[in-house]
Amino acid sequence: MPELPEVETLKNSLKDKLIGLIIENVELKRDNLRYKLSPLLATETLNTNILDVRRRAKYLIIDFNNDYSLIVHLGMSGRFTLQSANYKTQKHDHVIFDLSNGEKLIFNDTRRFGMIYSFKTDLLEKEFLNDLGIEPFSDLLTLEYLKDKLQTKKIPIKNLIMDNRVIVGVGNIYASESLHLARIHPDKSGNNLRDDEIENLIKAIRDVLTKAITAGGTTLKDFVNGDNKPGYFTKQLKVYGREGQSCLSCSSTIIKIKHSGRSTFYCKTCQYS
């Protein structure tokens, strides 16, 4: 599932190309997605001018001049790409936006777990994104904030940093990578972390996410940016997906365990605490 770096990469690849364009036609191809397409999606975006392209958590948001916004979540396999005027529709294309420069903006989702909605811009934070925690790069993510969130939690720290009500955008890949960089065992209870460990973890999360964004995200199978290019952070993964291989820091064997049904990868030597 695309995480914060992938959505940030998608935003960066689309923003300068979309701002100022007009949506001249909207085609809804099918409605049998997990989150069904609303007919209002077409009427609330048609003939609008694109003002901004931004990200909140794992959501891509496109703001229009009619006080509506488009909210896109890629789900497991979603793609949101720019295509040329002579693009041939593909099997899993669900929404096609014809743009005023002749290009097409395509929402494609093979597994159909993604979502694409239109919503009043001024109500987004109050009614749609209201349960989300703070951004990893926000100045609000401090020792005091995270310590307060962790002090009563007796569940594994990996689960806690993946909780979007606490910190947004840190999915399975980057949680494993961040904990390895911070040298914290993924099973350690949140309320048992020392202050220095919390500070190291905040820094590690930011460092890992920054490197992933610079590399264009992580493509394990489906992810591409708006220009149809994959992410290359896969080549920099230290533990994720490396079960049985040697740790790149100490040469111990990478171990795989399960947390809430998700695979977790760690090094028992580096992550002893």
Curated annotation (Swiss-Prot):
GO terms for molecular function: 8-oxo-7,8-dihydroguanine DNA N-glycosylase activity; class I DNA-(apurinic or apyrimidinic site) endonuclease activity; damaged DNA binding; zinc ion binding. It comes from the Bacteria. Gene3D superfamilies: 1.10.8.50, MutM-like, N-terminal (3.20.190.10). Its cofactor is Zn(2+). PANTHER family: FORMAMIDOPYRIMIDINE-DNA GLYCOSYLASE. Involved in base excision repair of DNA damaged by oxidation or by mutagenic agents. Acts as a DNA glycosylase that recognizes and removes damaged bases. Has a preference for oxidized purines, such as 7,8-dihydro-8-oxoguanine (8-oxoG). Has AP (apurinic/apyrimidinic) lyase activity and introduces nicks in the DNA strand. Cleaves the DNA backbone by beta-delta elimination to generate a single-strand break at the site of the removed base with both 3'- and 5'-phosphates. This is Formamidopyrimidine-DNA glycosylase. It comes from Rickettsia conorii (strain ATCC VR-613 / Malish 7). The gene is mutM.
